Swiss-Prot record:
One record GO biological process: inositol catabolic process
Cofactor dependency: Fe cation
Protein name: Inositol oxygenase
Pathway: Polyol metabolism; myo-inositol degradation into D-glucuronate; D-glucuronate from myo-inositol: step 1/1
Pfam families hit by this protein: MIOX
Modified residues (Phosphoserine): S33
Provenance organism: Mus musculus
Amino acid sequence: MKVDVGPDPSLVYRPDVDPEMAKSKDSFRNYTSGPLLDRVFTTYKLMHTHQTVDFVSRKRIQYGSFSYKKMTIMEAVGMLDDLVDESDPDVDFPNSFHAFQTAEGIRKAHPDKDWFHLVGLLHDLGKIMALWGEPQWAVVGDTFPVGCRPQASVVFCDSTFQDNPDLQDPRYSTELGMYQPHCGLENVLMSWGHDEYLYQMMKFNKFSLPSEAFYMIRFHSFYPWHTGGDYRQLCSQQDLDMLPWVQEFNKFDLYTKCPDLPDVESLRPYYQGLIDKYCPGTLSW
C-alpha cells in the first residue's frame, strides 16, 4: 500500500530563494499559489504548533531503540517507492529515483569524494517514518531548534507558532531558550523529521562516514540556518566550519530532480560498493 507523504515543503515553498535564481533552475519552484500552497501552510501550522521540547523528546525515545525493522540500505531505498510525493504531481516515477539523481549529481561534481555520493543516496531515507504512521509535519519540511524562540527566517514564522505551548513557557521563549551561547548544534534539540531520524539511525548503526556526512544528513532541511543565516548564537566554530558542506549538498538535493531518469540498475553495483564500504549489512531502523 502506498502512503501519501504529501509535498515536501522544503522543495515546494522557498520564500528565501532569489526568484531570478530559481527561474534558472528546474521547475520545482512553480508552486507559489493556490491549493498546494494552502496545504503547505497547513503543514507548517501543524508542525509549528506540535513540535515542542516534549514532543521531540518523546519521538527520540520512541524511535531511539531502532526496533521498527531490520533491513539493508538498498531495501530502504526501495521502500521510498511506497511514498507518494505530490511535490512532483506531473512526473510519475518512483521516489527512489530522486535518491539516485541526487547521488549522481554529486558524483559528477565531486568525483573524488565517494562518501559524498553515498550521502546523496541516503539523505531522504528517514521519510520511511511515514510508512510507520507519522504525519507529514513530523517527517518532511524545514527543521528548526525547539526549546528557544523561532527566528525570523523560519517559514511562516509570524503566523504559525501562536498555539505552540513552548512559547508560553519562559524557559523556551527567549532567543537562547534552554541553551547556552555557542553551545554547538550537537547539543541542540532539533524538530523531529526525516533528517533527525536518519542522523540518529546512522549514529546507532555506527556508519563509518566522515563528520561532514552526518552534518549534511542532520541539517539539510535546516533552512533557517544554512540559507536564512539565523541561529548563529547557538553555533560552535565546528558548526560554522561545516556550514559550507551543508550548503554544497543542498544544491544537489534541490536541483537534480528532473524527468531524465537514471539507469538505476546500472548504477546499483557502484552504490552497493559504497554501502559495503561505509554501512554494510542488515541495519536496525
